[in-house]
Amino acid sequence: MKQFLLFLSFPILMFCSCTKDPKGIVNMRDLSNYIIADSLHIRQGMLFRAAHLADATDDEIQYLATLPTTKIIDFRLEDEKRDRADRVVHGAEYINIPIDASGNVMAQATDEEKKKFGGNKRFDLRKIIVMIAFNDKAKKVAREIYHNLFFNSDCQAQYAHFFRELIATDTGAILYHCTQGKDRTGVASALLLAALGADRETIIADFDATNAVYEADIRKYSRRVRFFGGKEDEVAVVKAFIGVNTDNFIRELKQIDEQYGSIENYLKGPIGLTDDDINTLRKRYIIK
């Protein structure tokens, strides 16, 4: 069984619950939780994945500043940033690398639905998810989002940019995030863990951990969808937009293997990493 290292010396590293009025950074974790191979692991306090920082507490912002955090990388689109602007972390450079995999839930809602439920507010968004679970376009997005993130050339270019920022950073911690810290951020973590030498089991475990964070909401809104007559196809939309669909993610990893031979070849192909790049990342972030 895969072993995991847990560093819980500071509350920020623990999962935050998904609530109507969240306080704190949701779905945040330090990648040092994972053993890579042969007792190697990622340096603690260097690489963080998370949801947006709009609801970060003062203590969390102070913690990130004192690490220190060198870069905050935001994968969100302009409208997402405008609705929930990140709190500022003193001393950190803010870098926007927008990734659009057509997974924006609000894009699947009609103007009438958006108006009825108050625009882009986070809690109201979940009400809209229940409504659009029966929408064929939303079902298509739910099925294809990971494929787009891995195989769309624009997405690949943005993940290549993400790696260039990592490689160019000599000191300090890096935090990267999207809105919920699950799809765009989850794929970024998968690629980063692969570059650092993590095995497939670890990559999948990190991706799937998001479902533990959002489990209560997934169950709640899945029940609502079933109440209105929804079947597995409709429930799959809720799971994909609120949590992650790990089976679909694994399917795309297999597609990478089929098309490129391995995820390492994929990193050296469309993502553009060289052997020197990978060695730089491993020397910087991996320790015994």
Language-model region placement:
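Ser/Thr-glycine-rich phosphate-binding loops at phosphate-binding pockets of nucleotides
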Residues: Q180, R184-T185
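Sec-dependent signal peptide recognition
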Residues: K2-L8
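Bacterial Sec-dependent signal peptides at the C-terminal "C-region" and cleavage site
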Residues: L8, I12-D21
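Cys-dependent protein tyrosine phosphatase-like superfamily
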Residues: C18-L175, V187-K288
